[in-house]
């Protein structure tokens, strides 16, 4: 009986064959060495690890944070302008939609579209929801929390997306009068 033996020094990532990379959003961008040869870097050094931070920023993955005093959603939408984004409240969910028409780029014609839906906690100050887009393409939705027991009655409405002028700032949270 033949047994397949994998030596510890030959541990390679499955690279583009691994299902988690199936929906990466790298359309129309340049290639890196590990995109062409995913096994090469880990074959030479089993201790080499690719940057998780780069993969997080470029993958379109969102981050949802529920802190003591506020609720935040961060989403990488670097391929979209504020005019191509739609953020709206529907029931107790926030829907984020981005779409731009087909356009010519260096590598060919590209069109992009996405839909994301997030459940909103019931203890948010609905009138103070703010949404902004940074220069780096990070969409930030921020909302302060109310006192425990104060539940929101969500009304369907659009949320305007503002463009941040400064790098690394978060949208202002308006105080309820």
UniProtKB/Swiss-Prot annotation:
Residues 146-177 are annotated as: Disordered. One of its GO terms (molecular function) is unfolded protein binding. Keywords: Acetylation, Cytoplasm, Disulfide bond, Eye lens protein, Glycoprotein, Metal-binding, Nucleus, Zinc. The modification N-acetylmethionine is found at residue 1. Glycans are attached at residue 162. It comes from the Eukaryota. Residues 52-162 form the sHSP domain. GO terms for cellular component: cytoplasm; nucleus. Residues 162-177 have a biased composition (Basic and acidic residues). SUPFAM superfamilies: HSP20-like chaperones. Zn(2+) binds at residues 100, 102. Pfam families: Crystallin, HSP20. GO terms for biological process: lens development in camera-type eye; negative regulation of apoptotic process; protein refolding; response to heat. Disulfide bonds join 131-142. It is found in: Cytoplasm; Nucleus. Belongs to the small heat shock protein (HSP20) family. Contributes to the transparency and refractive index of the lens. May act as a chaperone, preventing aggregation of various proteins under a wide range of stress conditions. Heteropolymer composed of three CRYAA and one CRYAB subunits. Inter-subunit bridging via zinc ions enhances stability, which is crucial as there is no protein turn over in the lens. Can also form homodimers and homotetramers (dimers of dimers) which serve as the building blocks of homooligomers. This is Alpha-crystallin A chain.
